[in-house]
From Swiss-Prot:
The gene is mrtB. Belongs to the methyl-coenzyme M reductase beta subunit family. The keyword Transferase applies. Coenzyme M binds at residue 367. One of its GO terms (biological process) is methanogenesis. SUPFAM superfamilies: Methyl-coenzyme M reductase alpha and beta chain C-terminal domain (SSF48081), Methyl-coenzyme M reductase subunits (SSF55088). This is Methyl-coenzyme M reductase II subunit beta.
């Protein structure tokens, strides 16, 4: 029997019904098989850039930006022999013939997706085993395939794994993981939040609602890891994932469609009207001036509605400008206006608005060190909202028309090419709905 009475209808990115009368817990990371598979694949997947390795060796461009070692050039036809290398990597990585190791060639052998077996993940203390094992296997596979001698073997290692272990990360490497090294996390349990918005956008091929959905899934699943979504707060996070992330009851789609030619303010008006109609909030009292003070019938559901309105306002505002830079101020002033309009707390009970203050400063104010797309939930500036701010950033970068110095194409080309080949990464909304359909009658 479900723990919560909430039941939702799940709609797709096109506003069409996918699954109806779904228990809220069916979209929980603890119950939904699609989310479980997605998180597992995030941890065990590595993108290897064979074309990059070949180019690094040919130019002796090793260990990162501006590093060249004349005289150490090595000519190896790596892409041409991608299939043989992939087969060798598989034999080195797998633990048995029938395990779930997965090796996939992409772009005619220019890249490889390596998914290490869950048996290796199970005996590791953290998720970096996927990058370390894959890197070591690719190095050995190239050495074996081309009979590289002991004098050039270290160049192969550096072309594959970069400066590691001289650095704590893989600076200058030609392999990428979605999760950064644990030593760079802002706090315990922040691993799933350490995926920049541009990566999410590239993986979903700039589909706005799927990008915000994937971001929401990663952010809200992290809340279960950090202990935020436990006990009294679990329902709040599940409702946030359902409505803001997965377009429950088509609320997100309806708000965007209704305000296609509107503003942040009109989205707020639509949201409050919908919340009153659905019985989420009610007028507590009316002042002599006519100002209405609202009170929620359900605090957690109000937060989910407010978060959905926040994402809708971002889509409307940034979509009108076709420039992602406005996302920070949209997150800030949507909440500011919403609080004045209703007398109720903003999204995430103030944390989203607080996050936006710092986000505005560090993304384009006096400091302006980085565009919105390079931020993530593990960033010191944007970590403070408990899963409700970053989906807006992902949506904004989908709608950007090339205004950013840190564009999706520049920062996330390899990640997008490799991970977008996995359907539940590329289209999470429909696949999570399928997962919910599998388990809803078992709850």
């Amino acid at each position: 029997m479900p723990m919560y009475e909430d039941r939702i209808d799940l709609y797709g990115a096109d506003g069409k019904l996918l699954e109806e009368d779904v228990p809220l817990e069916a979209i929980s990371p603890l119950k939904n098989p699609t989310i479980a598979n997605l998180v597992s694949d995030v941890k065990r997947s590595v993108a290897v850039n064979l074309a990059g390795i070949e180019g690094s060796l040919r130019k002796a461009a090793l260990g990162g930006k501006s590093n060249f070692i004349p005289g150490r050039e090595v000519e190896l036809p790596i892409v041409e022999n991608a299939e043989a290398i992939a087969e060798k990597v598989k034999k080195l990585v797998q633990t048995s013939e029938d395990d779930d190791t997965n090796i996939r060639l992409i772009n005619n052998g220019q890249q490889i997706l390596v998914q290490v077996p869950t048996t290796r993940m199970g005996v590791a203390a953290d998720y970096t085993v996927s990058a370390l094992v894959t890197g070591a296997a690719v190095v050995q596979a190239i050495i074996d395939e081309f009979d590289v001698d002991m004098f050039d073997a270290n160049a192969v290692k550096t072309a594959v794994m970069g400066r590691y272990p001289q650095t704590v990360d893989f600076t200058g490497a030609n392999l990428s993981t979605l999760l950064g090294p644990p030593v760079l996390l802002e706090g315990l349990g922040y691993g799933l939040r350490n995926i920049m918005a541009n990566h999410v956008v590239a993986i979903t091929r700039k589909n706005t609602l799927n990008a915000s959905a994937l971001s929401s899934i990663l952010e809200q699943t992290a809340m279960f890891e950090t202990g935020d979504a436990v006990g009294a707060f679990e329902r709040m996070h599940l409702l946030g994932l359902a409505y803001q992330g997965l377009n429950a009851n088509n609320l997100l789609f309806d708000l965007v469609k209704e305000n296609g030619k509107g503003t942040v303010g009109t989205v707020i008006a639509s949201l409050v009207e919908r919340a009153v109609e659905d019985g989420v909030v009610k007028v507590a009292r009316e002042m002599n001036s006519g100002y209405k003070v609202y009170e929620p019938a359900d605090w957690a559901l109000w937060n989910a509605y407010a978060a959905t309105g926040l994402l809708a306002a971002t889509i409307v505002n940034v979509g009108a400008a076709r420039a992602a830079q406005g996302v920070a101020s949209t997150v800030l002033y949507y909440n500011d206006i919403l609080e004045y309009e209703t007398g109720l707390p903003g999204v995430d009970f103030g944390r989203a608005m607080g996050t936006a203050v710092g986000f505005s400063f560090f993304s384009h104010s006096i400091y302006g060190g980085g565009g919105p797309g390079i931020f993530h939930g593990n960033h010191v500036v944007t970590r403070h909202s408990k899963g409700f701010a970053l989906p807006c950033v992902a949506a904004a970068m989908c709608l950007d028309a090339g205004t950013q110095m840190f564009s999706v194409e520049k920062t996330s080309g390899l990640i997008g090419s490799v991970y977008s080949e996995i359907d539940y990464f590329r289209e999470p909304i429909v696949n999570v709905a399928k997962g919910a359909a599998e388990v809803k009658d078992q709850l």
